[in-house]
Regions:
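Conserved lysine of the Walker
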Residues: 14
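Conserved small/polar residues in nucleotide/adenosyl-binding loops
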Residues: 134-139
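The conserved Walker
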Residues: 10
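Hydrophobic anchor at the beta1->P-loop junction of P-loop NTPases
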Residues: 6
Length: 151
């Protein structure tokens, strides 16, 4: 079983996409807002975001160890936060240039390492394509992981 990270700015469509993907893979869902709420930790500083990435990683690894596919959606704004999260497959939801929160916009570093690049808010279109790529015996056998928005 594997862990998928769906990352991007607030309002980009991460949760919507993850919610569309989960039933296609019979996956367990981890939503960063819900995990943060359960921990009652509303610190959005760099240190708070590291704690959140570690919490998300711990929860994802527990579900994976129980034999589940896991889809986690969270901002993962920095390379450090992304390194802390044990994703087997990374989806960058890159549909907006600025999110709702200025501090997050300032902190967010566009990912360099990802397996799929979503460029439009069309989760019903993207979810099956991502799941096909993810479950393909050799994902690189498909023409590209950066499918055009018209695909």
């Amino acid at each position: 079983m594997k862990i998928i990270l769906v990352m991007g700015l607030p309002g980009a469509g991460k949760t919507t996409l993850a919610d569309e993907m989960a039933p296609l893979l019979n996956a367990k869902r981890l939503n960063a807002d819900e995990v943060r709420k359960a921990a009652n930790d509303w610190d959005f500083s760099a240190e708070g975001r590291v704690r959140q990435a570690k919490r998300m990683a711990e929860a994802a690894l527990k579900l994976k160890a129980e034999g589940h596919y896991v889809i986690a959606d969270f901002i993962a704004p920095t390379p450090e936060a992304r390194k802390l999260f044990p994703a087997d497959f990374r989806v960058w939801v890159d549909t907006i240039k600025e999110g709702r929160f200025e501090d997050t916009n300032l902190m967010f570093v566009n990912p360099k390492n990802f397996d799929f690049h979503v460029t439009t808010q069309d989760a019903k279109n993207w979810a099956p394509k991502i799941c096909l790529l993810y479950t393909s015996p050799s994902p690189r056998d498909l023409s590209t992981s950066r499918m055009p928005s018209s695909a």
